């Protein structure tokens, strides 16, 4: 069988009727507030000193070193992160400078290649132009020579045709064929 709790169970024969708003005064409640009683003041001061001493010891030896180590570790981690960030920034700056340098070099090489290509194409075009010009000059000279020989041949034929026509005209008008020598003299006189 369970034993009753002496703190919550009233003593036998006690009045258990509860009246709301009514506080019953007993001998246990008489006197001053216990912390303010001067009879146990020295014991309270000793316990206060012991409690604060124990609290100070625990704070000094356990809590504060842990907090200090946490703060120190955090400061070290922050310092390491800042150093790493500075190093990464320096690397990024160096990479940016290297990129800019490489870009300028590439642009310079591209300009050089473009200029070289333009020069090569201009030289090739000039060579082709000169070759074509030489070829055209040769064809022109050949054409002029052909025209000259054909003109001379045609003029020779014209003289023959003119001589024949003049001979036919003189023969028709006079009824006699002209002699060849006088006909050649007359043709020579009209040619100059």
Swiss-Prot record:
Q: Where in the cell is it found?
A: Cell inner membrane
Ranges annotated as spanning the membrane: 39-59
Task: Specify whether Transmembrane is a keyword of the entry.
Answer: yes
Q: How does it sit in the membrane?
A: Single-pass membrane protein
The terms under GO molecular function for this entry are:
proton-transporting ATP synthase activity, rotational mechanism; proton-transporting ATPase activity, rotational mechanism
Q: Which UniProt keywords apply?
A: ATP synthesis, Cell inner membrane, Cell membrane, CF(0), Hydrogen ion transport, Ion transport, Membrane, Transmembrane, Transmembrane helix, Transport
Q: Which residues form the signal peptide?
A: none
Q: CDD domains in the record, alphabetically?
A: ATP-synt_Fo_b
This entry carries the following GO cellular component terms, namely: plasma membrane; proton-transporting ATP synthase complex
Subunit info here reads:
F-type ATPases have 2 components, F(1) - the catalytic core - and F(0) - the membrane proton channel. F(1) has five subunits: alpha(3), beta(3), gamma(1), delta(1), epsilon(1). F(0) has three main subunits: a(1), b(2) and c(10-14). The alpha and beta chains form an alternating ring which encloses part of the gamma chain. F(1) is attached to F(0) by a central stalk formed by the gamma and epsilon chains, while a peripheral stalk is formed by the delta and b chains.
Known function: F(1)F(0) ATP synthase produces ATP from ADP in the presence of a proton or sodium gradient. F-type ATPases consist of two structural domains, F(1) containing the extramembraneous catalytic core and F(0) containing the membrane proton channel, linked together by a central stalk and a peripheral stalk. During catalysis, ATP synthesis in the catalytic domain of F(1) is coupled via a rotary mechanism of the central stalk subunits to proton translocation.
Which family does the similarity line name? Belongs to the ATPase B chain family.
This one is known as ATP synthase subunit b 2
Q: Which organism is it from?
A: Methylobacterium radiotolerans (strain ATCC 27329 / DSM 1819 / JCM 2831 / NBRC 15690 / NCIMB 10815 / 0-1)
Gene that this sequence comes from: atpF2
């Amino acid at each position: 069988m369970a034993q009753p709790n002496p703190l919550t169970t009233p003593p036998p024969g006690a009045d258990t009727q509860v009246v709301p708003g009514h506080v019953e005064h007993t001998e246990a409640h008489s006197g001053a507030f216990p912390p303010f009683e001067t009879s146990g003041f020295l014991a309270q001061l000793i316990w206060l000193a012991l409690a604060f001493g124990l609290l100070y010891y625990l704070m000094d030896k356990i809590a504060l070193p842990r907090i200090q180590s946490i703060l120190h570790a955090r400061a070290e981690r922050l310092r390491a992160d800042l150093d790493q960030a500075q190093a990464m920034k320096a690397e990024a700056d160096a990479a940016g400078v290297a990129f800019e340098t490489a870009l300028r070099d590439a642009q310079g090489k591209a300009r050089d290649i473009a200029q070289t290509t333009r020069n090569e194409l201009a030289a090739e075009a000039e060579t082709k132009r000169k070759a074509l010009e030489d070829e055209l000059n040769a064809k022109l000279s050949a054409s002029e020579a052909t025209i000259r020989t054909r003109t001379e041949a045609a003029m020779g034929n014209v003289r023959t045709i003119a001589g024949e026509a003049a001979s036919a005209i003189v023969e028709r008008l006079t009824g006699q064929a002209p002699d060849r020598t006088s006909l050649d003299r007359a043709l020579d006189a009209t040619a100059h």
